[in-house]
Regions:
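Active-site and donor-binding regions of nucleotide-sugar-utilizing enzymes
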Residues: 94-163
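Histidine-anchored nucleotide/phosphate-binding helix
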Residues: 46-65
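Short N-terminal or domain-adjacent regulatory/targeting segments
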Residues: 2-37, 47-51
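Active-site-proximal region of nucleotide-activated glycan assembly enzymes
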Residues: 1-7, 153-185
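Short, charged/polar "capping" segments at the starts of alpha-helices
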Residues: 48-49, 77-82, 153-154
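Short hydrophobic segments within beta-strands
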Residues: 40-43, 72-74
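Gly/Ser/Thr-rich loops at beta-strand to alpha-helix junctions
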Residues: 44-48, 128-130
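Conserved nucleotide-cofactor-binding alpha/beta core module
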Residues: 61-114
Length: 185
C-alpha cells in the first residue's frame, strides 16, 4: 500500500533537488582523446536503448581510446522486475526504484559511482527522471555535459542546445562530436 501519493512524492523530490547544494568537485575540461574514464547516464526503457548506449560506449572506446566507459541506467521498475538482459557487469550498472529513498534519491549501490572522479559525465536524458538528476547532482565527475536541461542547469559545465526536429540519437551524437572536436585541455 502506497501511503504517500505519487504526485506529492514527485513534488517533494523536485523541491529537494532544486534546493540541494552543488557537490564540491575538481572541475577540469578535456577533449575526448585525452580522457581516461567517463560515465554515460541514461534512462533505460527497453532493450533497444540498452544496446544503443552499449554501442555508443564501444564506439567511444575504439574511436577515441577512452580506457573506461561506464554506463549507468535508471530503470523505473522494482528490482524484481528488472529485465534479464540488463545485468550488472564490469562497465555497466543500473539503479531502480528499490535503490531510492522515499523521495527518489539514489541511496544504495550507485553511491561508489557518484564518488568516483570520472573525467566526464554525459547525461543522455536530462530532465527525464528525478533519480537521474540526483545522480548527476551528486557525481564528482570533473566535467558534466548534457543537452539542454531545465531543472538543474547549475550541475552542468556544458549544456548544448537542442535543434528542432532532432531525435535522441542525433542530440547525443552532437555531444560526442563536440567533446571530440573541442579544444578543452
Amino acid at each position: 500500500m502506497n501511503l504517500i501519493p505519487q504526485k506529492i512524492k514527485e513534488r517533494v523530490a523536485q523541491y529537494v533537488l532544486q534546493f540541494s547544494p552543488q557537490v564540491d568537485r575538481l572541475r577540469s575540461g578535456s577533449s575526448l582523446r585525452q580522457m581516461k574514464s567517463m560515465v554515460l547516464v541514461y534512462a533505460d526503457h527497453d532493450e533497444a536503448k540498452y544496446k544503443l548506449v552499449r554501442d555508443i560506449a564501444t564506439y567511444i572506446k575504439k574511436e577515441y581510446g577512452v580506457k573506461r566507459v561506464m554506463r549507468v541506467a535508471y530503470i523505473d521498475e522494482e528490482s524484481k522486475f528488472i529485465p534479464a538482459w540488463h545485468l550488472r557487469k564490469l562497465e555497466t550498472d543500473y539503479f531502480c526504484k528499490s535503490d531510492l529513498n522515499w523521495f527518489g534519491k539514489p541511496v544504495s549501490n550507485v553511491n561508489p559511482l557518484m564518488q568516483e572522479p570520472f573525467d566526464v559525465l554525459i547525461h543522455f536524458d536530462p530532465d527525464s527522471s528525478v533519480p537521474l538528476d540526483f545522480f548527476v547532482m551528486a557525481s564528482k565527475a570533473k566535467m558534466k555535459v548534457s543537452n539542454h536541461s531545465k531543472l538543474r542547469t547549475k550541475d552542468y559545465d556544458i549544456l548544448l542546445p537542442t535543434t528542432k526536429g532532432d531525435n535522441w540519437k542525433q542530440r547525443n551524437h552532437r555531444i560526442i562530436q563536440f567533446l571530440a572536436e573541442s579544444p578543452l585541455s
